[in-house]
């Protein structure tokens, strides 16, 4: 861009927000982020600031950094800040602040507060023009969201920089750009990417980056790098990317670091990077310590692999060499190719070699098949050594020396991988293997392991060892002479003094020689070690036997050992005694050890065979005899021949050589094998195990012996454990510490598993005798006392061998010990309770152990009387002693534990028996004794005991055997006693369950305790709010009641009544949510036929008690419960229960009973009646009967109130429909209850009158009959409705009740279908006849009304089905003739009239047009009836105030109901026959509107119905006719007038345009009269409802206000109707009407009333103003009809003729508003036409001469709009001259005139701005004069108002011009 272009661009940017005209300023100001442009254009800065500052506060809550902008961009004085007049430095600082704000705003664009705060920067500082780059850059990450489009939308298109031109399309289309569009823009413009990256770099430096920005940058960069060509990458992208990545890596933001990793990984994949750059990047990545922390380690390693595998070179990294702590273990699990892993590992290996991790790194590299990488690694290793020959030796550098062993292992591995290549590389370094070995001080080619050496020695036993040994001695002598360092170790000083090393007491000497032996061998070359060992043996040990004990114990056996045996063999020495010790080695895990010992056994076998085979007897020396049996008094040995057989059986030992653990199987075969002699197996067993059991053997041998022997014991080999019992097992506990010391010396790490476990496994096993079992139990109990790990082993052994113990005593010993451990406070390594519960125990064990903890043994007690609790008077004193209490407490704890174990076993196995049950009952009694007399905590023990009792009884009950229980021990009274004494609900519930189970097992035991049980449950259990109590209660009842029933006792009913009485007595204490389920389960258990009615009655008794106490809440609870309770049963069960309840009511005495009478005794003995009933007085009995009936009715009513399938009524209907057989289950009960109700009704109506009981009986009767379905119901009530059978008042009352009930029943019926009625057509037809006959007879007013209502309801239901309508149409037509007579519609009683209308409505709804023949008999009489209601109302309103207050409600209530009924009938005819209602439509509308007693909502709905159903044109004519001809406007009810106007507006809205045009004349006539309504109403005075306030002067202003308000509201409705009508007309049809309206307003043409001109003009201008607001410029030209009239009005206002006239002031205000609207909406320069201008200009300006204060602002606005509207300069000058006249001192003007003129000029300057600055020379002199005006108000108005506005427009002070 040229210099000139740059300067022009800069100037353009700076002046972008400067507007030279009003339209441009408005356009700039209307650009908004949150407001519509039209709204934004009208806003001032104060409003925008308020919105923005609230948003800033929200942002400050999100980020406190926004607070700093409160004193700059969002300061209070920023409202008046204008950047266009500021200095360059101020503007620069402003831009920096705005850019900083947008930078900080980036993360929060999704919050609405962000845009609302940005609104201030856009609107006040034009940030959308001057700071648009930052707006776009910060919002660009949100390119897919609407907020980005909003930001683009406020940026002017011409201001968008060229770098963002690609966003213009998105701005034009208001559509978000896609990611592909963004990428294409960055791809095509490298400068854009550089620009955005620079912006991001600045964000990173300021720590203002955010997630969306980083995601956007990465998505663009990662796509851009692979898509760019090589030149672009190298020249542009890579430098930019690397700069940004470097900043990201130095940041502490984890997201930025990971973003840099992503970019660098992609970069390394698309472009080859130099080694120098790779090192630089690696340094940058690892520079921050967090790179290798847990959260970044994996990503860091992955990136490093990507970077260093991107190059083709294999080289050492300087950067990686500085990082020896790289977490290489991550590389193994990282998801990347193996080739890349190997390459990176090789580079890293080379970079840090040598180090601690070098060998680990090498093991991770796959070098096979990759010769290049192998050479690279070898080169690294050899280069690090740098060998130099110094003094004949070879050494390496210091670093290599530090890791000599590691390098040695690495070199060996490399040689093993590829020796040929390694040798090749050695040659290139001019090195040999020997030199390398010297450097590393180790052998490189010795690859044989120690085990292989051992095999080698074993395989070469036949070599000439004498020669080798001689050679070794000679060499050693030469070395000694040469002064070799080996001479420092002199074995001649070592001397073995012990006779054998198989005795543990010689352990110190053994360990000393072992150390010396190891040290000696380490000094000898590997090839000479065998000879060295022979030399050591020869020099140190006295004889070969001693040396063998040394090697056997140490576990070291070489070829030299075989050599010693072989050399010792002289044909006279037997070696077979050593066989048992040699066999121990076959348990060693090492196969080489096992192989070596196998060779040794084979050698001994060969020697033995050589000596004794084919020879009878030969005396030989037993090798090893003294060593093995040194301390043994008895030597168990075998003969040589038996030894040969044993060797033959053992065979080659190949299996043991190859597989570990085979020795035990071999020994089992030997011990159980069949030889020539039957006892040979046991002989071998004795021989081997006797030697193994020698107590002197050290721990290293013993641990293997015990391991093998324990395996044999587990295999079931008999007698194995006996060999070790006395020598090892029995004394083990005493010698354990000694064994531990030996194990520590022998470095046996895991003593628990290696030694102790094997030993304890020898304790017990199969084939135990009773005595052995006891011994085993005692030893294990002693082991449990050890407080060491031995406890764990002993516990495990107890678990495994417990079933094998043969005596009960031995089991009890163990159980007692475990219980003691639990009771004691000592620490135990295991949980004894788990062990106890896992042991299989039988009843004999439990009987024995329970006997041991029996309390009777510790505390003697007196004999117990059967079924009586023992006395505690003598024992409390004894229990008071502390030692006795402690002892009892101890035994209680033991008992609790044993009972817990018993409970577990009862659940697992069948161990229950009567003996155990007897003991448990004895314990139950003892626990009760301890709890009451000893005050001990027995609750838990009782609970566990109850569980044991329950399980035992259940098991006995379910067994196939019949058990005889001891009734003296197993007693229910003991359980009841514990129940009463226990305070624990859990114990009580479990004991109840025990009773329930005992009732099924032995019913006779619990029979005598039933009453106490029931009493307890009613007093305690039933009140508990938990599932367990509820379950226990139900199970107890379920088991006890059948037990009672099975006894065939005559008191069974009494027992049930007693049980239910006990339970219901606690009803209020039972949790409410458990009541229903509890009593339902109880009823089902007792059988509903036995208990439901009793329960209902007992709850009725409680209802009576609550009523007497006036406890309504409790009464309601009982009603609700019984309702829910009944729903849980089948319908026939419910009815049966209610029926039996009525029987109990019948049994209730009617009068007070005589004492000792028969019925007295009968009722007294029944728990449900008792003394409370038999001792009641007659009055009390009547109250109780009334309460019980009320209770029953409440229940039935509450049940039927819920219309669902669970109600009794619905279920009866379903049952009767399902099957006809159900009739016999349902109907008899209802008939029986109905008979009861009728009989009782007769008694308490006629015989013993009692109105309250009679009323309840009527309700009961109604409820019972209501239960039946409609069909059955009709059948049952018809005879009760026949007037011929209603002989007395009671029958009439019953008939009325049935009629009401029937109406309600039919009303609730969902529908009547033809199918459901046809079957019972005769019944329904008969019902119609009965009803019509009752209507005609007029027997009783209430009865006749009920019949009419019933008829109406049934008829309405018939209309649902077309078939029913046709079937009954003739009956319904006939009924209309009856209903329209004096017996119905023409009756003098309003109740009958209302009911008749209801019946007529139902018939018309059903038959419709078929009733047209009776139209004259219905509509005209109905309208007359309505007129009678208005006459009554009028008479009421004309009475005195006092009379109105007294009787208004009573007299008007019936009239109101009649009016509503009439309106209902009219609406019915409008629905069914709308076309036939047209003839009377005027009357109908008047009837609806004048029904003042009816609610407006009802009248409104009927009027809407007329508008919807009747021809709309006819409706419109009728509405106009009602107003103009029927003079409805004279109505005194404003609500009716409002309803009329609403209906008129709705009609007009629905009217078609064609009809509107045709009826325009009619409407104009109506409109003129409507406009005259104001004047008419004001002359008429207040409506009737306000007239009575006229005598109260203080209320009269309120009356006037209400009148004015209602008049204005109706006038507004007139305008709405008029405008709605005008909108349906065109210009051609409306102009004549408008001209007529103007003539009426001006001249009074077509005026009906004598209305003043001012009033007419008021009405007209009000209407015309609303028309202008709606149609705007469309009606501007209509002003031609009234320009002159308006001018005349203005002149009259200015002439002060009407000054002080309120109407004139109002008219003046409305005329000014009218002119202002016309000026505002003028778009065709209508008022610029000279004639119109002349006729309106001066009259308008003249208003300033006498304008009222209240309307001055309207004049100012009108003149201002007038000046703005006129376009020519001449017109403006005319206006200016006219205004100057009113402020000039050449003419006399009032101060008020000057002030309003000044305000007008101020408003003009504010609106016209610079356009009026040209008139400033004319105004300045006058302004100067006004500033010196005598009136201070004038001076202030000029100085504070006009001058400031002019200065703001002028841009400089006015003082210079004024001076």
Swiss-Prot record:
It is found in: Nucleus, Nucleolus; Membrane. This is U3 small nucleolar RNA-associated protein 10. Belongs to the HEATR1/UTP10 family. The gene is UTP10. Involved in nucleolar processing of pre-18S ribosomal RNA. Involved in ribosome biosynthesis. It holds the Pfam family BP28CT. It comes from Lodderomyces elongisporus (strain ATCC 11503 / CBS 2605 / JCM 1781 / NBRC 1676 / NRRL YB-4239) (Yeast). HEAT repeats lie at residues 578-616, 1819-1857. Component of the ribosomal small subunit (SSU) processome. InterPro entries: ARM-like (IPR011989), ARM-type_fold (IPR016024), BP28_C_dom (IPR012954), HEAT_type_2 (IPR021133), HEAT_Utp10/HEAT1 (IPR056473), U3snoRNP10_N (IPR022125), UTP10 (IPR040191). SUPFAM superfamilies: ARM repeat. One of its GO terms (cellular component) is 90S preribosome. It is a multi-pass membrane protein. PANTHER family: BAP28 (PTHR13457), HEAT REPEAT-CONTAINING PROTEIN 1 (PTHR13457:SF1). The chain crosses the membrane at residues 258-278, 1392-1412. The lineage of its organism: Eukaryota, Fungi, Dikarya, Ascomycota, Saccharomycotina.
């Amino acid at each position: 861009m040229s210099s000139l272009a740059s300067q022009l661009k800069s100037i353009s940017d700076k002046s972008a927000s400067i507007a030279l005209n009003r339209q441009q300023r408005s356009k700039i100001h209307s650009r908004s982020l949150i407001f519509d442009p039209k709204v934004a254009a009208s806003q001032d800065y104060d409003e925008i600031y308020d919105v923005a500052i609230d948003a800033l506060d929200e942002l400050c809550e999100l980020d406190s950094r926004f607070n700093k902008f409160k004193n700059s961009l969002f300061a209070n004085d920023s409202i008046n800040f204008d950047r266009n007049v500021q200095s360059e430095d101020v503007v620069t600082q402003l831009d920096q602040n705005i850019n900083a704000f947008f930078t900080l705003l980036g993360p929060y664009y999704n919050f609405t507060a962000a845009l609302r705060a940005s609104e201030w920067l856009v609107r006040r500082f034009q940030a959308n023009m001057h700071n648009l780059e930052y707006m776009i850059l910060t919002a660009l990450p949100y390119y897919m969201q609407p907020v980005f489009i909003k930001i683009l939308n406020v940026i002017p298109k011409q201001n968008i920089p060229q770098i963002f031109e690609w966003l213009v399309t998105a701005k034009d289309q208001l559509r978000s750009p896609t990611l592909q569009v963004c990428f294409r823009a960055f791809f095509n413009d490298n400068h854009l990417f550089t620009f955005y990256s620079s912006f991001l770099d600045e964000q990173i430096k300021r720590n203002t980056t955010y997630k969306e920005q980083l995601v956007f940058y990465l998505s663009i960069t990662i796509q851009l790098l692979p898509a760019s060509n090589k030149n672009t990458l190298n020249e542009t992208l890579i430098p930019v990317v690397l700069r940004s990545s470097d900043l990201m890596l130095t940041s502490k933001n984890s997201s930025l670091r990971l973003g840099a990793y992503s970019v660098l990984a992609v970069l390394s994949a698309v472009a080859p990077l130099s080694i120098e750059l790779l090192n630089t990047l690696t340094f940058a990545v690892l520079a921050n310590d967090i790179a290798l922390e847990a959260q970044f380690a994996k990503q860091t390693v992955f990136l490093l692999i990507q970077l260093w595998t991107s190059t083709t070179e294999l080289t050492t990294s300087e950067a990686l060499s500085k990082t020896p702590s790289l977490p290489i273990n991550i590389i193994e699990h990282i998801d990347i190719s193996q080739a890349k892993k190997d390459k990176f590992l090789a580079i890293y290996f080379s970079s840090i070699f040598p180090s601690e991790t070098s060998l680990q790194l090498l093991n991770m590299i796959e070098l096979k098949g990759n010769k290049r990488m192998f050479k690279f690694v070898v080169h690294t290793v050899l280069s690090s050594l740098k060998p130099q020959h110094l003094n004949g030796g070879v050494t390496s550098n210091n670093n290599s020396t530090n890791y000599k062993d590691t390098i040695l292992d690495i070199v060996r591995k490399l040689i093993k991988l590829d020796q040929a290549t390694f040798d090749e590389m050695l040659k290139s370094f001019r090195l040999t293997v020997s030199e390398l070995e010297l450097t590393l001080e180790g052998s490189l080619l010795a690859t044989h392991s120690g085990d292989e050496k051992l095999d080698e020695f074993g395989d070469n036993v036949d070599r000439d060892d004498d020669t080798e040994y001689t050679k070794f001695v000679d060499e050693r002598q030469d070395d000694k002479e040469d002064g070799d360092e080996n001479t420092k170790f002199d074995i001649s000083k070592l001397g073995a003094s012990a006779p054998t090393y198989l005795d543990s007491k010689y352990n110190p000497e053994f360990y000393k020689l072992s150390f010396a032996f190891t040290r000696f061998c380490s000094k000898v070359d590997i090839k000479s070690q065998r000879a060295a060992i022979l030399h050591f043996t020869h020099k140190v040990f006295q004889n070969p036997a001693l040396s063998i004990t040394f090697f056997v114990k140490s576990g070291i056996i070489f070829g030299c050992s075989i050599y010693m045996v072989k050399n010792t063999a002289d044909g006279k020495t037997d070696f077979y005694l050593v066989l048992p010790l040699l066999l121990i080695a076959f348990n060693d895990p090492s196969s080489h050890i096992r192989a070596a010992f196998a060779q040794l056994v084979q050698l001994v076998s060969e020697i033995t065979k050589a000596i004794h085979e084919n020879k009878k007897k030969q005396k030989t020396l037993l090798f090893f005899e003294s060593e093995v049996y040194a301390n043994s008094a008895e030597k168990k040995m075998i003969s040589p021949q038996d030894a040969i057989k044993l060797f033959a059986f053992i065979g080659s030992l190949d299996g043991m050589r190859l597989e570990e653990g085979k020795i035990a199987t071999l020994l089992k075969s030997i011990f159980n094998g069949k030889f020539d002699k039957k006892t040979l197996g046991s002989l071998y067993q004795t021989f081997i195990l006797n030697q193994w059991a020698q107590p002197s053997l050290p721990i290293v041998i013993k641990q293997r012996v015990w391991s093998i022997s324990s395996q044999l014991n587990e295999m079931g080999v008999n007698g194995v454990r006996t060999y070790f019992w006395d020598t090892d097992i029995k004394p083990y506990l005493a010698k354990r510490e000694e064994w531990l010391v030996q194990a520590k010396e022998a470095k046996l790490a895991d003593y628990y598993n290696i030694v102790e476990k094997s030993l304890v496994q020898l304790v017990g096993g199969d084939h135990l005798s009773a005595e052995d079992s006891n011994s085993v139990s005692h030893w294990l109990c002693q082991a449990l006392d050890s407080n060491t790990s031995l406890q764990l082993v002993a516990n495990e052994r107890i678990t495994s061998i417990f079933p094998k113990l043969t005596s009960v005593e031995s089991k009890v010993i163990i159980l007692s010990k475990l219980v003691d451990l639990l009771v004691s406070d000592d620490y135990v390594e295991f949980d004894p309770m788990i062990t106890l519960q896992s042991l299989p125990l039988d009843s004999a064990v439990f009987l024995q152990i329970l006997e041991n903890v029996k309390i009777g043994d510790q505390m003697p007690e007196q004999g117990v009387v059967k079924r009586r609790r023992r006395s505690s008077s003598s024992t409390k004193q004894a229990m008071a002693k502390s030692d006795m209490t402690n002892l009892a407490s101890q035994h209680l704890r033991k008992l609790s534990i044993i009972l817990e174990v018993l409970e577990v076993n009862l659940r697992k196995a069948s161990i229950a028996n009567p003996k155990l049950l007897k003991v448990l009952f004895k314990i139950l009694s003892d626990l009760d004794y301890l709890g009451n007399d000893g005050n001990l905590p027995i609750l838990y023990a009782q609970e566990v005991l109850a569980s044991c009792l329950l399980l035992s009884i259940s098991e006995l009950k379910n067994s196939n055997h019949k058990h005889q229980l001891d009734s003296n021990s197993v007693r229910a009274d003991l359980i009841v006693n514990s129940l009463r004494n226990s305070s624990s609900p859990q114990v009580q519930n479990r004991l109840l369950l025990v009773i329930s189970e005992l009732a099924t097992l032995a019913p006779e035991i619990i029979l005598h305790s039933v009453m106490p049980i029931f009493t307890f449950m009613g007093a305690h259990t039933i009140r508990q709010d938990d599932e367990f109590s509820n379950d226990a209660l139900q199970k107890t009842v379920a088991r006890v009641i059948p037990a009672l029933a099975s006894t065939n006792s005559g008191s069974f009913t009494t027992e049930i009544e007693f049980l239910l009485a006990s339970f219901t007595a606690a009803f209020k204490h039972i949790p409410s949510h458990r009541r229903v389920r509890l009593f339902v389960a109880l009823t089902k258990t007792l059988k509903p036929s036995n208990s439901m009615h009793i329960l209902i009655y007992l709850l009725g008794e409680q209802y009576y008690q609550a009523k007497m106490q006036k406890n309504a809440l409790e009464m309601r609870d009982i009603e609700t419960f019984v309702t829910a309770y009944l729903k849980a049963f089948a319908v026939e069960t419910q009815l049966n229960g209610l029926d039996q309840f009525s029987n109990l009511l019948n049994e209730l005495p009617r009068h007070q009973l005589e004492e000792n009478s028969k019925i007295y005794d009968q009722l007294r003995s029944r728990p449900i009646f008792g003394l409370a009933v038999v001792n009641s007085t007659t009055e009390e009995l009547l109250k109780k009967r009334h309460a019980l009936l009320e209770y029953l009715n409440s229940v039935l009513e509450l049940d039927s109130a819920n219309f669902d399938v669970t109600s009794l009524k619905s279920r009866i209907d379903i049952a009767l429909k399902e099957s006809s057989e159900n009739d016999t289950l349902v109907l008899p009960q209802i008939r029986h209850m109905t008979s009861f109700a009728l009989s009782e009704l007769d008694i308490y109506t006629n015989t013993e009158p009692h109105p309250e009981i009679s009323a309840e009986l009527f309700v009961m009767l109604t409820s019972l009959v209501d239960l039946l379905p409609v069909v059955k119901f009709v059948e049952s009530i018809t005879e009760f409705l026949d007037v011929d059978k209603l002989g007395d008042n009671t029958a009439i009352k019953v008939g009325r009740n049935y009629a009401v009930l029937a109406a309600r029943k039919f009303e609730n019926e969902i529908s009547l279908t033809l199918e459901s009625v046809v079957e019972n057509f005769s019944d329904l037809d008969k019902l119609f006849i009965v009803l019509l006959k009752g209507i005609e007879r007029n027997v009783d007013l209430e009865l006749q009304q009920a019949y009419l209502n019933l008829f109406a309801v049934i008829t309405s239901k018939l209309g649902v089905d077309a078939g029913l309508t046709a079937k009954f149409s003739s009956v319904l037509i006939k009924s209309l003739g009856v209903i329209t007579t004096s017996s119905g519609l023409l009756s003098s009683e309003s109740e009958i009239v209302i009911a008749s209308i209801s019946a007529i409505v139902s018939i018309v709804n059903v038959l419709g047009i078929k009733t047209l023949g009776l139209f004259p008999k219905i509509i005209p009489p109905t309208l007359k009836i309505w007129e009678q209601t208005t006459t009554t109302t009028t008479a009421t309103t004309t009475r005195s105030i006092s009379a109105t207050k007294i009787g208004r409600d009573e007299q008007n209530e019936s009239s109101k109901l009649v009016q509503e009924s009439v309106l209902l009938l009219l609406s019915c005819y409008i629905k069914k026959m709308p076309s036939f209602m047209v003839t009377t439509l005027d009357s109908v509308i008047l009837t609806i509107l004048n029904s003042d007693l009816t609610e407006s909502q009802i009248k409104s709905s009927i009027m809407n119905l007329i508008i919807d159903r009747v021809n709309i044109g006819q409706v419109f004519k009728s509405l106009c006719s009602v107003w103009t001809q029927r003079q409805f406007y004279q109505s005194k009810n404003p609500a009716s007038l409002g309803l009329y106007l609403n209906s008129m507006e709705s009609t007009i809205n629905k009217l078609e345009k064609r009809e509107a045009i045709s009826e325009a004349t009619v409407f104009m006539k109506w409109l003129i009269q409507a406009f005259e309504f104001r004047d008419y109403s004001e002359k008429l005075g207040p409506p009737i409802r306000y007239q009575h306030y006229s005598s109260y002067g203080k209320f009269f202003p309120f009356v006037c206000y209400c009148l004015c308000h209602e008049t204005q509201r109706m006038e507004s409705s007139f305008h709405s109707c008029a405008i709605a009508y005008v909108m349906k007309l065109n210009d051609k049809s409306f102009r004549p009407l408008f001209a007529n309206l103007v003539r009426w307003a001006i001249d009074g043409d077509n005026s009906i009333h004598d209305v003043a001109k001012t009033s007419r003009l008021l009405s007209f201008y009000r209407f015309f103003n609303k028309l202008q607001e709606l149609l705007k410029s469309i009606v501007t030209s209509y002003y031609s009809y009234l320009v002159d009239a308006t001018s005349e009005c203005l002149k009259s206002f200015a002439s002060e003729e009407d000054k002080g006239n309120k109407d004139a002031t109002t008219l003046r205000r409305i005329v000014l508003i009218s002119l202002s609207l016309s000026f505002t909406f003028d778009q065709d320069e209508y008022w610029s036409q000279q004639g119109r201008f002349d006729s309106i200009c001066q009259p308008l300006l003249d208003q300033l001469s006498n304008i009222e204060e209240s309307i001055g602002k309207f004049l100012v606005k009108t003149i201002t709009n007038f000046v703005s509207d006129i376009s020519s300069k001449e017109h403006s000058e005319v206006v200016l001259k006219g205004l100057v006249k009113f402020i000039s001192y050449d003419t006399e003007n009032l101060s008020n005139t000057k002030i309003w003129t000044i305000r007008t000029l101020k408003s003009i300057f504010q609106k016209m701005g610079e356009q009026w600055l040209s008139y400033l020379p004319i105004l300045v002199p006058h302004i100067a004069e006004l500033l010196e005006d005598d009136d201070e108000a004038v001076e202030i108005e000029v100085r504070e108002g006009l001058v400031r506005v002019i200065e703001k427009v002028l841009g400089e002070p006015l003082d210079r011009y004024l001076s």
